[in-house]
Amino acid sequence: MSSLRTDNDTWDIASSVGATAVMVAAARAAETERPEPLIDDPYAKILVAGAGNGAWQYIADDGFVAKVTESDPEIGPLFEHMKNYQAVRTHFFDAFFAAAVDAGIRQIVILASGLDSRAFRLPWPAGTTVFEIDQPLVLAYKSSTLASHGVQPTADRREVPIDLRQDWPTALTHAGFDADQPTAWLAEGLLMYLPADAQDRLFAQITELSAPGSRVAAESMGIHAQDRRERMRERFASITAQFDVEPMDITELTYEDPDRADVAQWLTAHGWRAEAVPSQDEMRRLHRLVEIADGDDQSFSTFTTAVKR
């Protein structure tokens, strides 16, 4: 059970789960500026810059990482791993959407979209509708920030400002969603913030709303042993104290329920053809795997994709 979460908690872009979206956007911004990037997200930097001051400022700051590494030599590879992971994850799910539209799907739903800019940066075919579901304040920040820079969506983008713990299927339908049309669903950076029963309920709702031929993609986090979690917590606490950085412990926001269902197995049992790709395999394939202390196969996440039968 997460110690910082409550059943009806809310957040904006600078607090709680919302702040993690800024950290992910910072990693995408850093990747975009690499010589040979895996992704191109020209809007990530804009979204990070408008979010104010926070721990996310240091994710892509090579100078800061170098200073921290002098104090803790294992931190450098860990920060590099974190940035590489976000790049590989984004690349994987970009490819998922490309395959979906190539198959003729024109209805997209991004769950807990955060600062995801795919509705603005991907080359969607004519007639594509992208629904984004998230907390009202998060969606409002993204829309207003990008609009102030003259950024326009490349699809028919529709906001669904609602918490996924509420009746989001009704809100989605009111926004124009058509359950008779095949849909491509994405749950990226989401499941770890849901209790096990809420995850099952989410996929049951997706299944009910999905016409045959629909597709779903999801990221599920690996298992982190309690002692490893404690070591990481102590390490980052030391960094924040030593370098006067605003503390942010993501593990306090997530749920590591031991009885959480395996996503691919759940989908297979409920009418989907599912495939699971260990994230370390994808990182290795793209030459982005960084060896880190305390790393093992169980600690890596899994990328699952499925097609509705």
UniProtKB/Swiss-Prot annotation:
GO annotation terms (biological process): methylation
Family: Belongs to the UPF0677 family.
Assigned EC number: 2.1.1.-
Protein name listed in UniProt: Putative S-adenosyl-L-methionine-dependent methyltransferase Mvan_0104
Signal peptide: none
Enzymatic class: transferase
Gene Ontology MF terms: methyltransferase activity
Binding-site list for S-adenosyl-L-methionine: 134, 163-164
Task performed by this protein: Exhibits S-adenosyl-L-methionine-dependent methyltransferase activity.
Superkingdom of the source species: Bacteria
Alphabetical UniProt keywords: Methyltransferase, S-adenosyl-L-methionine, Transferase
InterPro entries linked: Ppm1/Ppm2/Tcmp (IPR007213), SAM-dependent_MTases_sf (IPR029063), SAM_mthyl_Trfase_ML2640-like (IPR011610)
